[in-house]
Amino acid sequence: MRPRGTPPSFLPLPVLLALAVIAAAGRAAPAAAAAPTADPAATPALPEDEEVPDEDGEGVATPAPAANASVEAGRATLREDLREIKARDGDATFYVCPPPTGATVVQFEQPRPCPRAPDGQNYTEGIAVVFKENIAPYKFKATMYYKDVTVSQVWFGHRYSQFMGIFEDRAPVPFEEVMDKINAKGVCRSTAKYVRNNMESTAFHRDDHESDMALKPAKAATRTSRGWHTTDLKYNPARVEAFHRYGTTVNCIVEEVEARSVYPYDEFVLATGDFVYMSPFYGYRDGSHGEHTAYAADRFRQVDGYYERDLSTGRRAAAPVTRNLLTTPKFTVGWDWAPKRPSVCTLTKWREVDEMLRAEYGPSFRFSSAALSTTFTANRTEYALSRVDLADCVGREAREAVDRIFLRRYNGTHVKVGQVQYYLATGGFLIAYQPLLSNALVELYVRELVREQTRRPAGGDPGEAATPGPSVDPPSVERIKTTSSVEFARLQFTYDHIQRHVNDMLGRIATAWCELQNRELTLWNEARRLNPGAIASATVGRRVSARMLGDVMAVSTCVPVAPDNVIMQNSIGVAARPGTCYSRPLVSFRYEADGPLVEGQLGEDNEIRLERDALEPCTVGHRRYFTFGAGYVYFEEYAYSHQLGRADVTTVSTFINLNLTMLEDHEFVPLEVYTRQEIKDSGLLDYTEVQRRNQLHALRFADIDTVIKADAHAALFAGLYSFFEGLGDVGRAVGKVVMGIVGGVVSAVSGVSSFLSNPFGALAVGLLVLAGLAAAFFAFRYVMRLQRNPMKALYPLTTKELKSDGAPLAGGGEDGAEDFDEAKLAQAREMIRYMALVSAMERTEHKARKKGTSALLSAKVTDAVMRKRARPRYSPLRDTDEEEL
């Protein structure tokens, strides 16, 4: 407040506006509060010498109330109301502030210079294509030509055979045979010539003369290759018991395989696991003879205008190619020649980014992509593609990708700024960046173009970065190595994201805070003239009293007083001066609980003034709210009416909320530089494929189901066949008959031998031998009997009857010998001779039947002649003797 008697100083317009707002709020506050009742709860007794104002506003002299007059019965006392306020709103401390004497003076600090608000980095939006190191090998189709040579040594026993050794080797197919036989006719020679221990050796299939054998498709084929061969079965030598025999098998194999080669492409490996120490790009065309090779010149041949033939269908290719053929000690390999550029590229495209922001951070660029959640750091100097070895594909693929993305997304809203730029980022990533400019800022195109030109390497033209250099590389080239993990770029993206957000937020807060303090300093300087005590207290941080001493403030420390030691009077009228009233309530207080009572006047914000000089003319309709303790007291017509808590008065906040943007959520997506398939396929040799092919080789080019059993007579038949084969057509015809007869004999003998080798057959043969021995014994006895007594042996029954008939005669007397009949004896002899003739005729007829028809007829004629012979000279005997009759 200004000193008394001095005119009010001129206030600036912002201060006047602020004071007007405060005054309007002060006038609105009583209206917002509850209107006092007609019969207030605590209406003080008016003094007798103070007049009560009427409705017209003219005051009537009425006596002033006493200093501590009590209220009427039935109304709450002021002390009780204050106690309720303190119990409800909490305790509040009062302060007694003595007037400052000028012993301590203070001044406000001058405005400070504020930091500049961060205006952000120089961002450039654009399209990016990120390239990585190409770890995939160069793959191409190759054809292997070789002959599997197998020499087996077998020992044959009587009942079994045993392999004593197997020699296996591979021999290359000569160039002439590949061109004139395999590719021209689909056949292969049955011989194999190869060098081992510096000596040339020749193997003949089946140990026979050289001939052409047709190639047939392999029985089992893989998804990536085909194969052809000439024979399924291994040749085994002929069986000769107790001798060692040798047999040779030559299997000509043509196999399509996959070949791989990795940087620097000095060698390649076949899917079978065989290494070829020659660059796949070696040849005699376009300067390719400078590529690496480890073989002599006569082992390599390059054929122009080569038409490859499909050995399965016999069809010839429609277009000719340049064919490379190389002979190694084990095989011959052929492949289609191709130039090194652009067949291979040391870089490959990794990601296409539709939105890539490029920000300047000191001497580096940071390329950020929200889609990839990554930030790549690169030098601000462009990277020349001519420094990368075999990178012709980068410029072509980058331009194609940029043009495709631009036409799809930015064709109607943006324009391209300059050419595609290339930057080598940390981790070995090559970024092809195409800056874009929106159509709204197209007028800045020239400025941006000039800026881009200044960033180019010294001495470079505008098309150098986008257009690959000449085919001849500079003397020193390098290969970009890309890390297998991109986590560092993702961490960089996270750090940049948080750093950008926090730095922008804190920078703007610091700038706004500084500017606010400087602006508030002006208000503080003007407000201290109105209420220096409040300004000084707010500035110092504790309750003080202050007054202006020119351009400085004199301050004094306030003494705190407990709320229980403060008593408020319920009337603010001045008894001695009619028409004059106190502008603020009167209070009595004690510094200590048992100290003397001191009179004072309630100031602002619970300040107790030791002087009661705050006066004003009494007015009609007086209503005031005064802060007392933790609440408010309401005075109406200069008398206490009732109390209010702070919550009963509508609060108008002067606090300015600090609206800070929270850090936005961001989800990381899985990101791989190289997939599992790329890592698996990055090696020069695929061991899985090698093992699969090696184990499938026997199934593809050999018959594993057919079993050849050793034949002891194979040598005999082979010799006979060779003998009759050399006699021409007649010899072959005779040979068939002889071979049939010999085969029958051998089969019979083999059948008997097989029967005897059977246990049941041996038992049967043993029984037959015993039966034969028994029959021979009985036959021998019969022959001996026949020699001793033919009649008894031949006619045992007749002899027995004759013997029984002659027995009585012999036993009847001595005259028996004399009675012997000579005629009967002669008849008996005749009968024996007749029986011998009959037996001879039967034997003759039996032999004639065996000899044939002519002999049988001769026997019949002889029989007829014998039957027509003269009648015998004897007659049959009668049953009774004539002498007896």
Curated annotation (Swiss-Prot):
InterPro entries: Glycoprot_B_PH1 (IPR035377), Glycoprot_B_PH2 (IPR035381), Glycoprot_B_PH2_sf (IPR038631), Glycoprotein_B_ecto_C (IPR055341), Herpes_Glycoprot_B (IPR000234). Residues 35-759 are virion surface. Disulfide bonds join 97-558, 114-514, 188-252, 345-393, 581-618. It is a single-pass type I membrane protein. GO terms for cellular component: host cell endosome membrane; host cell Golgi membrane; host cell plasma membrane; membrane; viral envelope; virion membrane. Coiled coil: none annotated. Residues 1-34 form the signal peptide. Glycans are attached at residues 68, 122, 379, 411, 659. One of its GO terms (biological process) is symbiont entry into host cell. A motif (Golgi targeting) lies at residues 834-837. Residues 47-58 have a biased composition (Acidic residues). Residues 29-46 have a biased composition (Low complexity). Residues 781-885 are intravirion. Residues 704-757, 716-756 are annotated as: Hydrophobic membrane proximal region. Keywords: Disulfide bond, Glycoprotein, Host cell membrane, Host endosome, Host Golgi apparatus, Host membrane, Host-virus interaction, Membrane, Signal, Transmembrane, Transmembrane helix, Viral attachment to host cell, Viral envelope protein, Virion, Virus entry into host cell. It is found in: Virion membrane; Host cell membrane; Host endosome membrane; Host Golgi apparatus membrane. Residues 29-74, 455-478, 866-885 are annotated as: Disordered. Envelope glycoprotein that forms spikes at the surface of virion envelope. Essential for the initial attachment to heparan sulfate moieties of the host cell surface proteoglycans. Involved in fusion of viral and cellular membranes leading to virus entry into the host cell. Following initial binding to its host receptors, membrane fusion is mediated by the fusion machinery composed at least of gB and the heterodimer gH/gL. May be involved in the fusion between the virion envelope and the outer nuclear membrane during virion egress. Belongs to the herpesviridae glycoprotein B family. Homotrimer; disulfide-linked. Binds to heparan sulfate proteoglycans. Interacts with gH/gL heterodimer. This is Envelope glycoprotein B. It comes from Herpes simplex virus type 2 (strain SA8) (Simian agent 8).
